[in-house]
């Protein structure tokens, strides 16, 4: 029986995503994102959405704006 709900990834999937976010890369390129998605058993779209939301959460925790603009803006 799966613990996955329509609201998001399972605990095991989050563990994989968090490991990659914290230890590998906060901004994975498309190839890396595809590999992370395959490892977690999620779609690339779900994985990309998770990374975008997690990055915004991390930026807020660091006292940075959730969306980063270019230094030339």
UniProtKB/Swiss-Prot annotation:
Listed GO biological process terms: chaperone-mediated protein complex assembly; heart development; lung alveolus development; negative regulation of cell differentiation; negative regulation of transcription by RNA polymerase II; positive regulation of gap junction assembly; positive regulation of skeletal muscle tissue regeneration; positive regulation of striated muscle cell differentiation
DNA-binding region as annotated in the record: 3-62
Highest taxon of the lineage: Eukaryota
SUPFAM superfamilies xref list: Homeodomain-like
Quaternary structure (record): Interacts with serum response factor (SRF). Component of a large complex containing histone deacetylases such as HDAC2. Interacts with the acetylated forms of HSPA1A and HSPA1B. Interacts with HSPA8.
Gene Ontology cellular component list: cytoplasm; nucleus
UniProt KW keywords: Cytoplasm, Developmental protein, Homeobox, Nucleus, Repressor, Transcription, Transcription regulation
Organism lineage string: Eukaryota, Metazoa, Chordata, Craniata, Vertebrata
Protein name according to UniProt: Homeodomain-only protein
């Amino acid at each position: 029986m799966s613990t996955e709900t329509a609201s998001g990834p399972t605990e095991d999937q989050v563990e994989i995503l968090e490991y990659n976010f914290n230890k590998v890369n906060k901004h994975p390129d498309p190839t890396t994102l595809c590999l992370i998605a395959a490892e977690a058993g999620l779609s690339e779209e779900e994985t990309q959405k998770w990374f975008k939301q997690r990055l915004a959460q991390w930026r807020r925790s660091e006292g940075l704006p959730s969306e980063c603009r270019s230094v030339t803006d």
